[in-house]
């Protein structure tokens, strides 16, 4: 695609029918903002030549895409789609574009192949738009044709049969291709003389026809995937379709997915051929599951990495965690951001880790909290052990040396270090460093007293 063609996403609206405080384009599908699916569909065609018009709660959209190479244009007042184009015009011109494809930010089912097709079909047009024929056109803008040629697009609420004739079933999808040189003279002529009091991008069509420009309405059959998401029911429908599309893609790519109808996978997740997933299971964000890894049912992963030969057992929760090769996690384990398991490390049931590392072969079998900790190779953490890392104001680190053995029900009060090969007796409260190859016991002495006879 030539570098003079770009894309504009309209994402400034409130989406009141979603009954939510956040912008409609931030409603989540498979753990991702709806807007991301639109951006992902456009990126292979336009690269970084994609702008997004934001308005309502723009701050939330900025935060959702912080750190990413996204370009935004602000529409302070939401005065319609035509006004949104006017707000973006200077940016589009400054980028040296000849053509721009305009899409709505609430079309998560939009496919890259559809955009490719549309660009080829509209190559010679001054203005082109995609249309569908629906048995029930609903609230979508109607396409008016005279002798097969496009005459205008009329919003449903403004349609008057006395002016335009019998109401057609062909509707506008809201996807446009505009030649900037042709449209530039038309933009200032948009008015808000309609029932909504808004400036419609659709009015450019009628203006262009009046100027005898080349206007095309490109028909795409009855594909509902081109339509926007306007309410919770449509959001759930779109999510179901995308979930199926993504899961089938992974299966066809060589991933073994059991009960695939119960598995949810983010479009940003990477699952290598030869990995095995048991449903129900949820894999979100930039998670990566390597070849030969197994994730069992009822697990939840976000931005987690699981290397080959590792097994994540049922009911485990991993977020921002890294699981090395040949590891075992769970069942019922929780690995929070910054948790790292090196090769052949093991974490059992009801173990929680946060900003903690288990080096090669280290084990924490059950009922343990490891926070802000470094556990050396081959060390063993007994049941009920906790690192007391927070003093009410600051966090402190615990270091456990290679080959150390921490007895059950031990409290390690950070900052503290247990040296290599040391043994900590069960039930100890360790407040001072333990030298290498030492035995540390810090608990009250047991006293046995005879019971008094019952009266």
UniProtKB/Swiss-Prot annotation:
Pathway this chain belongs to: Nucleotide-sugar biosynthesis; UDP-N-acetyl-alpha-D-glucosamine biosynthesis; N-acetyl-alpha-D-glucosamine 1-phosphate from alpha-D-glucosamine 6-phosphate (route II): step 2/2; Nucleotide-sugar biosynthesis; UDP-N-acetyl-alpha-D-glucosamine biosynthesis; UDP-N-acetyl-alpha-D-glucosamine from N-acetyl-alpha-D-glucosamine 1-phosphate: step 1/1; Bacterial outer membrane biogenesis; LPS lipid A biosynthesis
Region feature (N-acetyltransferase): 254-455
Domain of life of the source: Bacteria
Annotated catalytic residues: 366 (proton acceptor)
Keywords for the protein's UniProt record, in alphabetical order: Acyltransferase, Cell shape, Cell wall biogenesis/degradation, Cytoplasm, Magnesium, Metal-binding, Multifunctional enzyme, Nucleotidyltransferase, Peptidoglycan synthesis, Repeat, Transferase
Ligand binding (acetyl-CoA): 383, 389-390, 408, 426, 443
Cofactor note: Binds 1 Mg(2+) ion per subunit.
Cell compartment(s), UniProt: Cytoplasm
Essential cofactor(s): Mg(2+)
Gene Ontology process terms (BP): cell morphogenesis; cell wall organization; lipid A biosynthetic process; peptidoglycan biosynthetic process; regulation of cell shape; UDP-N-acetylglucosamine biosynthetic process
Record GO cellular component, one term: cytoplasm
UniProt-listed InterPro entries: Bifunctional_GlmU, GlmU-like, GlmU_C_LbH, Hexapep, Hexapep_transf_CS, MobA-like_NTP_Trfase, Nucleotide-diphossugar_trans, Trimer_LpxA-like_sf
Enzyme class, UniProt record, top EC level: transferase
The protein's name in its UniProt record: Bifunctional protein GlmU
Protein's organism: Nitratidesulfovibrio vulgaris (strain ATCC 29579 / DSM 644 / CCUG 34227 / NCIMB 8303 / VKM B-1760 / Hildenborough)
Gene: glmU
């Amino acid at each position: 695609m030539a570098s003079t063609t770009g894309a504009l996403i309209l994402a400034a609206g409130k989406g009141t029918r979603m009954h939510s405080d956040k912008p409609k384009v931030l409603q989540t599908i498979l753990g991702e903002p709806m807007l991301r699916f639109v951006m992902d569909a456009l990126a292979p065609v336009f690269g970084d030549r994609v702008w997004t018009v934001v308005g309502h709660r723009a701050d939330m959209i900025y935060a959702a895409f912080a750190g990413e190479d996204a370009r935004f244009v602000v529409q302070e007042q939401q005065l319609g789609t035509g006004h949104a184009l006017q707000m973006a015009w200077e940016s589009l011109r400054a980028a040296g574009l000849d053509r721009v494809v305009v899409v709505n930010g609430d079309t998560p089912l939009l496919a890259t192949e559809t955009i490719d097709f549309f660009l080829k079909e509209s190559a010679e047009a001054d203005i082109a738009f995609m249309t569908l024929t629906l048995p029930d056109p609903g609230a979508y803008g109607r396409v008016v044709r005279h002798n097969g040629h496009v005459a205008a697009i009329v919003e449903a609420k403004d349609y008057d049969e006395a002016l335009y004739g019998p109401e057609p079933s062909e509707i506008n999808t809201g996807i446009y291709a505009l030649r900037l040189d042709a449209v530039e003279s038309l933009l200032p002529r948009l008015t808000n003389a309609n029932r909504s009091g808004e400036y419609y991008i659709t009015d450019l069509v009628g203006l262009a026809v009046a100027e005898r420009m080349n206007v095309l309405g490109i028909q795409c059959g009855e594909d509902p995937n081109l339509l926007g998401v306007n309410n919770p029911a449509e959001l759930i429908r779109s999510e179901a379709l995308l979930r199926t599309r993504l899961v089938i893609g992974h299966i066809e790519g060589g991933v073994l997915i059991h009960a695939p109808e119960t598995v949810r996978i983010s479009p940003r997740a990477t699952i290598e051929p030869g990995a095995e997933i048991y449903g129900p299971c949820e894999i979100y964000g930039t998670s990566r599951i390597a070849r030969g890894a197994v994730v069992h049912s009822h697990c939840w992963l976000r931005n987690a990495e699981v290397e080959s030969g590792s097994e994540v057992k049922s009911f485990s929760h991993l977020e921002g965690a890294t699981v090395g090769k040949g590891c075992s996690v769970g069942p019922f384990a929780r690995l929070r951001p910054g948790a790292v398991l090196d090769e052949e490390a093991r974490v059992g049931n009801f173990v929680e880790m946060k900003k903690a590392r288990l080096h090669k072969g280290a084990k924490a079998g059950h009922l343990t909290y490891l926070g802000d900790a470094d556990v050396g190779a081959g060390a063993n953490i007994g049941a009920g052990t906790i690192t007391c890392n927070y003093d009410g104001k600051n966090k402190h680190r615990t270091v456990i040396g290679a080959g150390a053995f921490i007895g059950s029900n031990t409290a390690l009060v950070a900052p503290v270090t247990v040296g290599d090969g040391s043994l900590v007796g069960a039930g100890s409260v360790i407040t001072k460093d333990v030298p290498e190859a030492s035995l540390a016991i810090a608990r009250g002495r047991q006293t046995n007293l005879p019971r008094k006879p019952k009266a």
